[in-house]
């Protein structure tokens, strides 16, 4: 005698074994335990801590390992007309695939989503933080509004890339937001790829971007995300080719032009990178970010004495952003101004509230001064915290000459990129 669940294709027999249409299911232990919990609770929600306590038997369970397990259970259940639905912020539950179509988002939800996207376009930490909070509220209030969940994943990936959020928690939140969405939803695969890149799961990210490109080969966000993936995986030439196409499609997007400039340097096209950076400044007068970025690129490619005065002028504002001090210290280091460089670096690290990821940006000026051990220590602290931004930082051309030659540098490359990075 078996006990039938609300999802009638599945059942538990008297011995507690799983059956589908009268046939016993053969599953690995974790998947079997997860599905048993879902069946026992159906149609209710199983919380994540319940999975950890029973399926993981009290051992540590990461959000990512649970998500992978759920994905395998989904593959098993889909042909049987049953799906595992993610309930944002709570857990998972079993539902029949013939569930009612959710109601369309309200006008207020659409307006909140549009506002969050506008904030994200500002590309500032404050605006991105506000966008994330707005999207979190929106997803809680309208969990069936797929574009809002995609936008939340996108915003979290961007914030992680800047070093402003703890990577493991943010990536897990972003992947959970995408969980269970229609595979055809615009931007879904590209955002998942960006999140996986921040978790250093580059092979999985590559597969996500392949799906994204198949669905939207000329989408600017898709191409930009894939280009970044290529930079992380040390294919600067491939990244430059994609970014040139994105620049054609979105010629005025600052983040596109800055990423192209960075890719040109990484690919060995220094003079072209300087020209692109200077053109971006001319096309966007008064932008502190583009000016600072241009000075950093010029000092990396061809340091000139006149760059010092320009860099120091950036620091004279009443409320100088942290990135200005990073750029100023790098410019000074490339000009051999050791004492002035260390004054900025030491002050920033000792007297400012910086995350491990933000502190790692000072490794570049230290490396330029030959302080490789100290630079490696900053990078190691960020890698040990699994800061997603390190995928880009360790590919910085400022580190290309010393990281592969330094014992600590080789260990860093291995920990983030794997054995292939040392070949």
Predicted segment positions?
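Structural signature of tandem alpha-helical TPR/SEL1-like repeats
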Residues: 127-133, 162-177, 199-211, 233-245, ...
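Specific register positions within alpha-helical solenoid repeats of the TPR/Sel1-like families, i.e.
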Residues: 120-121, 157, 161-164, 197, ...
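Alpha-helical protein-protein interaction modules
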Residues: 240-242, 253-423
């Amino acid at each position: 005698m078996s006990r039938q669940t609300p999802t009638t294709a599945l059942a538990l027999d008297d011995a507690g074994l799983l059956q589908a249409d009268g046939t016993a299911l053969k599953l690995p232990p974790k998947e079997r335990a997860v599905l048993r919990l879902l069946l026992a609770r159906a149609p209710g929600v199983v919380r994540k801590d319940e999975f950890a306590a029973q399926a993981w038997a009290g051992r540590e369970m990461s959000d990512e390992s649970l998500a992978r397990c759920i994905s395998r259970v989904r593959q098993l259940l889909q042909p049987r007309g049953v799906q595992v639905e993610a309930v944002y912020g709570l857990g998972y539950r079993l539902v029949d695939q013939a569930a009612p179509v959710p109601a369309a988002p309200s006008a207020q939800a659409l307006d909140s989503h549009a506002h969050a996207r506008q904030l994200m376009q500002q590309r500032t930490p404050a605006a991105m933080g506000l966008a994330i909070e707005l999207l979190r509220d929106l997803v809680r209030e309208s969990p069936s509004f797929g574009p809002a969940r995609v936008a939340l994943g996108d915003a979290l990936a961007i914030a992680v890339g800047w070093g402003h959020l703890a990577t493991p928690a943010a990536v897990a939140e972003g992947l959970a937001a995408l969980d269970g969405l229609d595979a055809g939803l615009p931007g879904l695969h590209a955002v998942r790829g960006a999140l996986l890149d921040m978790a250093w799961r580059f092979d999985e990210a590559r597969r996500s971007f392949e799906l994204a490109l198949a669905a939207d080969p000329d989408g600017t966000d898709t191409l930009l995300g894939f280009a970044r993936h290529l930079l992380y995986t040390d294919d600067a030439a491939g990244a430059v080719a994609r970014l040139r196409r994105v620049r054609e499609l979105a010629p005025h997007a600052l983040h596109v032009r800055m990423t192209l400039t960075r890719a040109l340097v990484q690919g060995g096209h220094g003079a072209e990178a300087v020209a692109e950076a200077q053109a971006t400044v001319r096309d966007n007068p008064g932008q502190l970010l583009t000016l600072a970025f241009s000075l950093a690129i010029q000092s990396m490619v061809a340091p000139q004495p006149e760059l010092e005065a320009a860099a120091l002028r950036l620091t004279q504002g009443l409320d100088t952003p942290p990135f200005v001090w990073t750029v100023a210290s790098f410019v000074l280091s490339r000009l051999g101004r050791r004492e002035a460089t260390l004054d900025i670096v030491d002050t920033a690290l000792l007297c400012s509230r910086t995350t491990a990821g933000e502190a790692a940006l000072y490794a570049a000026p230290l490396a330029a001064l030959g302080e490789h051990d100290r630079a490696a220590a900053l990078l190691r602290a960020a890698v040990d915290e699994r800061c997603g931004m390190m995928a880009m930082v360790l590919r910085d051309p400022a580190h290309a000459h010393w990281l592969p030659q330094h014992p600590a540098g080789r260990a860093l490359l291995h920990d983030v990129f794997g054995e292939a990075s040392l070949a």
